[in-house]
């Protein structure tokens, strides 16, 4: 798959079209994985949120909310923030990775919104209270972990008789998968969710996922649940 990293060609010579501003977070990885899956040429710019780089004036012109990821598409001079909006934009731009049948499209949309409203914010709070602020707020830590486990249960039941979240592999899987990849941070016992493990490991084997996971910098192997 083509990938541009900080202006250096990674695999092929196609014209650079998209600037991606990102970091090694689940939301950032959604977009880098999508770009790899779609085969779009891009330049990845590291925005180190641990050093406050998301608050720099230059980045705020692209992402007024001071959040990664954000893109600039030089094909049409669009700039865009919010990972969900970017995924839908890239799907519409390429005609790929979202169902074309109206009924299936709206099934995909409901699960995409589920990710934005559920696993994204709730598991983000699990990360904060369990990994970065452990044992300092027991009520919050327990509350968000319980909600995270509930959301895992919702997804596991849904995947019981499905290979992917909505029929074929889609932007919905790309949106949800990076949040599950932090199961270790979340102290989730993956043995409780066998359908998620099957789905997760299948996606982890995709070359585009393996490439996109390492953007904007290598961070080691994708975590795989013990079996």
Regions found by a protein language model. Give the residues of each.
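GST-like fold's C-terminal all-alpha helical module
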Residues: 90, 115-207, 212-214
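Short secondary-structure boundary/hinge segments and terminal tails
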Residues: 52-53, 90, 201, 220-222
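Short, solvent-exposed turn/loop segments enriched in Gly/Ser/Thr/Pro and often Arg
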Residues: 48, 171, 216-219
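Short flexible/disordered coil segments
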Residues: 109-113, 182-186, 223-227
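GST-like domain detector, emphasizing the conserved glutathione-binding G-site
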Residues: 4-6, 12-142, 146, 156
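Enrichment for repetitive, rod-forming helical segments
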Residues: 11, 36-37, 189, 213
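Terminal-tail/helix-coil boundary detector
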Residues: 209-227
């Amino acid at each position: 798959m083509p990938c541009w990293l900080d202006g250096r060609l990674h695999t092929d010579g196609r014209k650079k079209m998209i600037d991606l501003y990102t970091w090694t977070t689940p939301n950032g990885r959604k977009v880098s994985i999508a770009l790899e899956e779609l085969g779009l040429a891009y330049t990845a710019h590291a925005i180190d949120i641990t050093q406050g780089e998301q608050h720099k004036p230059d980045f705020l012109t692209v992402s007024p909310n001071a959040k990664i990821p954000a893109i600039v598409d030089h094909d049409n001079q669009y700039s865009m923030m919010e990972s969900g909006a970017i995924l839908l934009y890239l799907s519409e731009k390429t005609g790929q990775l979202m169902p074309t049948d109206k009924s299936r499209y709206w099934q995909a949309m409901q699960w995409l919104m589920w990710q934005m409203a559920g696993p994204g914010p709730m598991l983000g709070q699990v990360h904060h209270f369990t990994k970065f602020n452990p044992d300092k707020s027991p009520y919050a830590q327990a509350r968000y972990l319980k909600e995270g486990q509930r959301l895992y249960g919702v997804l596991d039941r849904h995947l019981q008789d499905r290979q992917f979240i909505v029929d074929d592999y889609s932007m919905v899987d790309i949106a949800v998968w990076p949040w599950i990849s932090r199961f270790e941070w979340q102290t989730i016992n993956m043995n409780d969710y066998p359908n998620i493990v099957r789905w997760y490991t299948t996606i982890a084997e995709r070359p585009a996922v393996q490439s996109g996971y390492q953007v904007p910098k290598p961070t080691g192997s994708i975590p795989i649940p013990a079996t």
